[in-house]
Amino acid sequence: MVQEKVRVSTRTLQWKCVEARADSKRLYYGRFILSPLMKGQADTIGIAMRRALLGEIEGTCITRAKSEKIPHEYSTLVGIQESVHEILMNLKEIILKSNLYGTCDASICIRGPGYVTAQDIISPPYVEIVDNTQHIASLAEPIDLCIGLQIERNRGYLIKTPNNNFQDGSYPIDAVFMPVRNANHSIHSYGNGNEKQEILFLEIWTNGSLTPKEALHQASRNLIDLFIPFLHTEEENLHLADNQHTVPLPPFTFHEKLTKLRKNKKKIALKSIFIDQSELPPRIYNCLIRSNIYTLLDLLNNSQEDLMKIEHFRIEDVKAILGILEKHFAIDLPKKLKIGFESLAQSIYSESG
């Protein structure tokens, strides 16, 4: 095993990129270091940066497709090898970059036979296609394929809502706006005794719509913007123009609050742990999010059998989740959910003392 060496600052806090590469048009990698840091600071920064990289950076996706010739999402069209559902899934995977604000329209209008790829998307000049070779459909006959598209810039993810009215031929598409595919941090300590310092290593993978260095800059700026209000003096006598922004709070006594907290503390704790804190691989994370599993509480309300019913979920994914639950929370997920959450939470609480 070759031991890696990096040159770091010993006095002034500095960051630098120690590795950068483009594995493909849709996969960029970058590794960065920040040093010197006092004990504990690297973990604080690493956790905050990972969450900002995954959740605070905006991306551009196709969020809707429209064609009057499509009877329903799971139909097949004469002369096209793929089903409508497969075409929608291919559109979902198209990587875009833009400085778009809100939404805009785009379209595909092509005559077969031939392959339909991302380069056939007609979009405004401020929307750029990262990889023109991404496959959309295969036309086996001389037919016309015309699809209207809606492109949106946002952050996080957008789960499509069921649409029972297909008369307009419009179909929503799940969107994962996050341009950062994954982010990890690790810490290296050096020095002796009270002189110990830390180096933060930050690894970033992006989808090609921006570089890891650009992602790091955007995430840092977004974090700074979130903390700026705390730098201003608190306005004690705040006058609102009207009452529409005031929120009445229930008059709980301290005793009532304490009793309620004791009664529900395990459930509250589980609700407060979001699955993006568990360092899940992006594919597993996105599958869980699409199934409305956002917190550890949501996850524990499912059995291993339930997880296997999730679309695109594999037995390896369940094993990865079991490993993370055991490693970080000392919790096991039952193969079948035979007891309700309250009993499960109570048993977890009893085991933890």
From Swiss-Prot:
Reaction(s) catalysed (UniProt annotation): RNA(n) + a ribonucleoside 5'-triphosphate = RNA(n+1) + diphosphate
Location in the cell: Plastid, Chloroplast
Record-linked CDD domains: RNAP_alpha_NTD
Main location: plastid
Pfam families, alphabetized: RNA_pol_A_bac (PF01000), RNA_pol_A_CTD (PF03118), RNA_pol_L (PF01193)
SUPFAM superfamilies tied to this protein: C-terminal domain of RNA polymerase alpha subunit, Insert subdomain of RNA polymerase alpha subunit, RBP11-like subunits of RNA polymerase
Keyword field contains tRNA-binding: no
EC number of this enzyme: 2.7.7.6
Ranges annotated as spanning the membrane: none
Span list, region Alpha N-terminal domain (alpha-NTD): 1-234
Highest taxon, organism lineage: Eukaryota
Positions of region (Alpha C-terminal domain (alpha-CTD)): 266-353
GO BP field: DNA-templated transcription
One of the record's GO molecular function terms: DNA-directed RNA polymerase activity
Keywords of this entry: Chloroplast, DNA-directed RNA polymerase, Nucleotidyltransferase, Plastid, Transcription, Transferase
GO CC annotation, single: DNA-directed RNA polymerase complex
Alphabetical list of Gene3D superfamilies matching this protein: 5' to 3' exonuclease, C-terminal subdomain, DNA-directed RNA polymerase, insert domain, RNA polymerase, RBP11-like subunit
Domain notes: The N-terminal domain is essential for RNAP assembly and basal transcription, whereas the C-terminal domain is involved in interaction with transcriptional regulators and with upstream promoter elements.
Function: DNA-dependent RNA polymerase catalyzes the transcription of DNA into RNA using the four ribonucleoside triphosphates as substrates.
Assembly and binders: In plastids the minimal PEP RNA polymerase catalytic core is composed of four subunits: alpha, beta, beta', and beta''. When a (nuclear-encoded) sigma factor is associated with the core the holoenzyme is formed, which can initiate transcription.
Family named by the database record: Belongs to the RNA polymerase alpha chain family.
UniProt protein name: DNA-directed RNA polymerase subunit alpha
Record organism: Panax ginseng
Gene behind this protein: rpoA
